[in-house]
Structures are given as structure tokens and as C-alpha cells.
Amino acid sequence: MKHLRLALAILVVAMLGGRPALAHPHFQKTIVVKLPAGAEVTLTYNTTPANEMRAAEVKVGSFVTPRRPLVKLSSELKAGALTIAAGEYTLGVIKNGDNDWTMALYPGAIERNATPDPAKVIKLDSTYSSAQGKAEHMLIDITPGAGRFEGKAVLTLHFGTMFLAAALS
């Protein structure tokens, strides 16, 4: 009986100790989209929990990038009034206020804990909403646009209740 209790205790500890690792995986995601104009856009990112408490701590004017998602453009691309050169960019957001964010790109891949040069940040013509529901983990995609982005390819970033969209064509 003593051995059975010990075996059961070890099993319970092992199950409880292993549960967080099983309950919370992160996925490497890659999305490739060929836009009607011919450019290929590749999004590469790791899912991360939508921690809005950390987002609330971001200083106004700061560029932040949860897990440093990458956007690769095969050719030059129009994004609103901007022309963005072919290449690799880190996707992020700029905090404008408590409930106001702008989607942005930063040339190249940003190393972990590096401070991006604010002068190099490319602000995209984007919309922000907190009324699109909640994403428990960060979701990034390219979808057909609606509303003011009707008829355009739209880069979207959904993080908790924060939803940003920016036209890419």
C-alpha cells in the first residue's frame, strides 16, 4: 500500500508539473500571400499570449514588437501613400495613447532586447479598434479589406482586444 501511495504521488506531481508545458504551447507560423499586383508577402511569427497588462505599461510614442514578427516583401509595395522597398521588416505597433495604436514596420530583424531607432520606424496607414473581440494569443494575417480598406489587401494584428489593420495595396 505504501508503494502504491508513493507511485500515485509521483504520478500526480509529474502530471501537475507537465501540465503548464502542455497547456501553453507557442507555434511558429508562416503565412505567404501573393498580392494581385504580383508582390509576395511572407509573415513569420511566434504565437504569444495577449498580455494587455504589458501593453498598458508601454510609454506613449514607443514602438513595441511582441516576439518580433517578420514581414518579407518580394518587391516594392504601396501601403497607402507610402512606397515600401522590397526586403525584411519587423512588424510592431506604436502607442499613441491609452486606446490608440498605429501599426508600423522597422527595417530588418530586431535582436531581442535591442532598442529600435525611432527615426527608422515606418508608420503604416492603419486603423485601431478594441471592438473586434478578444484574441487570447497574437494573430497576424493578410485579409481582404473592408470599410475604408475595401478592395485592398490588409495586414491585421490582433492581440487581446487590440485589433489593428493596415492596407498593403
Residue positions per predicted region:
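Structured alpha-helical
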Residues: 11
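Mid-length scaffold segments of soluble, non-membrane domains
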Residues: 64-113
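Primarily secretory-pathway and cell-envelope proteins
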Residues: 22-64, 96, 108-169
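C-terminal segment of classical bacterial N-terminal signal peptides
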Residues: 14-21
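Bacterial N-terminal signal peptides that target proteins for export
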Residues: 1-8
